[in-house]
Curated annotation (Swiss-Prot):
InterPro entries found in the cross-reference section: Mito_Carrier_Antiporter, Mitochondrial_sb/sol_carrier, Mt_carrier_dom_sf
Taxonomic superkingdom: Eukaryota
GO biological process: blastocyst hatching
Purpose: Putative antiporter that exchanges dicarboxylates and sulfur oxoanions across the inner membrane of mitochondria.
Main location class: mitochondrion
Name of this protein: Solute carrier family 25 member 34
Membrane-spanning residues: 21-41, 59-79, 112-134, 184-205, 220-240, 292-315
Cellular-component GO terms for this entry: mitochondrial inner membrane; mitochondrion
Annotated compartments: Mitochondrion inner membrane
Source organism per UniProt: Mus musculus
Catalysed reaction equations from the record: a dicarboxylate(in) + sulfate(out) = a dicarboxylate(out) + sulfate(in)
Solcar repeats mapped onto the chain: 18-111, 115-208, 218-309
Keywords: Membrane, Mitochondrion, Mitochondrion inner membrane, Repeat, Transmembrane, Transmembrane helix, Transport
């Protein structure tokens, strides 16, 4: 019996193969485009994750309550443009992290590593880890900028940066080069599991949808459906590490550049669960899905469709 596409779970359709360098550009571009649409949700998610940090439930004010009211609260406090706080840093992060991530994943596909059992998971995880490390300084600045607001609505530590370049300069001057990678211990596991889930499930989900024959073989709806299924897996595995990563990046530091609240990933997990309860690791889950879900769907959709266009153009030119 002939195996289905889902059983074969091809890492990359041979008709859509492009060079790793092209994948770098397409992956970075696709995720930057998705970021423009989802950044307001990232602002809300960041503030919900910082609200009530290391305080017992019910003992702190809650300026942000749920998704819709939080969007309105941000707009009232910071203006409509406040919903795009940290956008420049977010675009820088998406370009750096996903450019590296898709480049490395494409190299793995080209080498045939993703055709091995579990290959897509391993390749996605390794590519995500490297991308997270490269993009960490941009994510650090993005988180701190998105947390900044007026005193009456402030949650978490307020860093008072004036912009991306100002923030990078301040961190470099006060903490040195290593300060730019503070919090990377939470970012790498976060993106590692998220990338593994995203790239592996997107490949399998797209093949599964194709097998159902709900849409034409090359329809963009196949890609969209694959992205929607993939987004569920991404949010499920990333949210606890996303909360931890946000807090590690935003915490104040002493003169030596050491975090004043957490000693690292494990310390943050333990303190958060002890003082706020285990459910605190899912703070901002609604906005997290509303942000990570559409971002996963849009980024994978843009990436896959752009790859098809480039591959067809290359094929027609030969």
């Amino acid at each position: 019996m002939k195996p289905t596409q889902a059983q074969m779970a091809p890492a990359m359709d041979s008709r859509e193969m492009v060079s790793p360098a092209v994948d770098l550009v397409l992956g970075a571009s696709a995720c930057c485009l998705a970021c423009v649409f989802t950044n307001p949700l990232e602002v809300v998610k960041t503030r919900l994750q910082l609200q009530g940090e290391l305080q017992a439930p019910g003992t702190y004010p809650r300026p942000y309550r749920g998704f819709v009211s939080s969007v309105a609260a941000v707009a009232r406090a910071d203006g409509l443009w406040g919903l795009q706080k940290g956008l420049a840093a977010g675009l820088l992060y998406q370009g750096l992290m996903n450019g590296v991530r898709f480049y490395c994943y494409s190299l793995a596909c080209q080498a045939g590593l993703t055709q091995q059992p579990g290959g897509t998971v391993v390749a996605g995880a390794a590519a995500g880890a490297l991308g997270a490390f490269v993009g960490s300084p941009a994510y650090l600045v993005k988180t701190q900028l998105q947390a900044q607001t007026v005193a009456t609505m402030a949650v978490g530590h307020q860093h008072q940066h004036q912009g991306v370049l100002s923030a990078l300069e301040t961190i470099w001057r006060q903490q040195g080069m290593l300060g730019l990678w503070r919090g990377v211990g939470g970012a790498v596991p976060r993106v590692t599991v998220g990338s593994a889930a995203q790239l592996a499930t997107f490949t399998s989900a797209k093949a599964w949808v194709q097998d159902r024959q709900w849409f034409l073989e090359d329809s963009w709806l196949v890609t969209l459906a694959g992205g929607m299924i993939s987004s569920i897996a991404v949010v499920a595995v990333m949210t606890p590490l996303d909360v931890v990563s946000t807090r590690l990046y935003n915490q104040p530091v002493d003169r030596a550049g050491r975090g004043q609240l957490y000693g690292g990933l494990a310390d943050c997990l333990v303190k958060t669960c002890q003082q706020e309860g285990p459910l605190a690791l899912y703070k901002g889950l609604g906005p997290a899905y509303l942000r990570l879900g559409p971002h996963t769907i849009l980024s994978m959709f843009f990436w896959d469709e752009l790859r098809k266009l480039v591959a067809r153009a290359q094929h027609q030119g030969t």
